[in-house]
């Protein structure tokens, strides 16, 4: 498997090296980094080239790196059933930088791009129907961003008296607490209060 991935990495560098920023093999997959400007050309090549044959897009997802200037990685996961190989294409983009839609190449990218936009706020230009897919229509923000509050902004509940769903600001019943527990697999070198009762 790794020999086939090494051959593929070498082939891509020789034939389409101008489209690739970097590549490495990790966890049994070839990881290729490219730019938003080159992603469509690279995806088209990977699908159409006889030595590649990546005809199946299995997923598009996002990764949030708030400390980086290019805050998000848009990650495309492709499968070549004929070659039995997988490849991961990473596209680092800034918060306000759009990415061209891959729907024209892989029709299945439609919902994947909608999910990535809904969860992270990454904009896909040329998408036929870019709207929320997992959150409510009036939802504010993008919940998988690392700066999104864990509690959210609003609480949604059914009001039996009003006979409808109501949206209210989140009201925490207790102050925020940091639950920092020891791992049950690590244990301690000392006896915690109450442990002596458990051993008896």
Curated annotation (Swiss-Prot):
Signal peptide: none
Gene3D superfamilies: NADH:ubiquinone oxidoreductase, 30kDa subunit
Domain of life: Bacteria
Entry-linked SUPFAM superfamilies: Nqo5-like
Location(s), subcellular: Cell inner membrane
InterPro entries (UniProt xref): NADH_DH_suC, NADH_quin_OxRdtase_su_C/D-like, NADH_UbQ_OxRdtase_30kDa_su, NADH_UbQ_OxRdtase_CS
Topology of this chain in the membrane: Peripheral membrane protein
Pfam families documented for this protein: Complex1_30kDa
A Gene Ontology molecular function term of the record: quinone binding
Keywords: Cell inner membrane, Cell membrane, Membrane, NAD, Quinone, Translocase, Transport, Ubiquinone
Reaction catalysed by this enzyme: a quinone + NADH + 5 H(+)(in) = a quinol + NAD(+) + 4 H(+)(out)
Cellular component terms per the entry's GO annotation: plasma membrane
UniProt enzyme class: translocase
Enzyme Commission designation: 7.1.1.-
HAMAP family xrefs: NDH1_NuoC (MF_01357)
Family to which the UniProt record says this protein belongs: Belongs to the complex I 30 kDa subunit family.
Function noted in UniProt: NDH-1 shuttles electrons from NADH, via FMN and iron-sulfur (Fe-S) centers, to quinones in the respiratory chain. The immediate electron acceptor for the enzyme in this species is believed to be ubiquinone. Couples the redox reaction to proton translocation (for every two electrons transferred, four hydrogen ions are translocated across the cytoplasmic membrane), and thus conserves the redox energy in a proton gradient.
Summary of subunit composition and partner proteins: NDH-1 is composed of 14 different subunits. Subunits NuoB, C, D, E, F, and G constitute the peripheral sector of the complex.
Protein name: NADH-quinone oxidoreductase subunit C
Source organism per UniProt: Rhizobium rhizogenes (strain K84 / ATCC BAA-868) (Agrobacterium radiobacter)
